[in-house]
Amino acid sequence: IDRITTAAAQRLYKPELKEAFQEMIERGWMSLSSPIWANMGTERGLPISCFNVHVPDSIEDITHKLGEVIMQTKIGGGTSGYFGNLRERGSAVSDNGKSSGAVSFMKLFDTAMDTISQGGVRRGAFAAYLDIDHPDAEEFLNIKDIGNPIQNLFFGINVPDYWMQEMIDGDVEKRKLWAKVLESRQQKGLPYIFFTDNVNRNKPQVYKDFNMLINASNLCSEIMLPSSTDESFICCLSSMNLELYDEWKDTEAVKLAVFFLDAVLQEFIAKTEGNYYLASANKFAKRHRALGLGVLGWHSLLQKRMIPFEGMEAKMLTTEIFKYLQDKSEKATQELARMYGEPELLKGYGRRNTTLMAI
């Protein structure tokens, strides 16, 4: 704890915050992500939980993104990738040959995860995302089947509004494919279902203003951030402990948590400067400074107060708590912007971070 809080205070050039950070962690008000525990304030690894890459449709770029994912895994992160730009199996390629399709390239990432460990702590993990209207979608849903060459990957299917509506309206082929999605979830617990239009309707205003599309989520499917060929999104995560909500709700805890995560992000930026395979993630971190302050212990708070999980009182408390978290974190990012400046993407927005909250 001392190592982590010292590093965070130093990154903010505010040594006086060390004690406050330490108190929050020791009291159990804030729970840190595994990479922060393992790597913050050390010379090894990075304190970031998750990464996502946008895989382009050329051999050179695919191999570069594979190298990026291997490096991200090596330094301690969970990884994911969007494969919707890859051409379908059997389509023509520039040397008069035929493409082996999006799913075949996922095998490279599957093999990498079987080989590389996350900062020497745990086996690598990767989630592949593909659009349901991609011609290789049916083959994609066979991942993890008995006998399938891909066994280690997690996978998510992207479903746009138009496709869902046509399926509901009775399109026979779409209904067959949707049945296969549901069957796969029943048998394997996968794919994640990612409703792309819904996600993009609810993304932060800055992403709407710059028309930045969110094409995929992360390994755990709780982060909604945009990636592109030259920017790979990262998740800078920790959680507030709702079981102890009554202890910290009238304190500066949420503000301190946002400050702490911004310090974690600053450490990531400093450590990845000049790293060839982490340049896209470094660029995203600098330009977006996206944070994900989540929660844990929600059920414990309800049990402690003897509140039924599905009752109206629980719903009202949910609204109260998350409104409080949002208000406090918004004020914190505005204060950070005044103290340290706005990043490139947020010039004129009066804030330091594109996102603040996660699950």
Segments predicted by a language model, with ranges:
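Extended catalytic cores of very large enzyme megasubunits
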Residues: 1-359
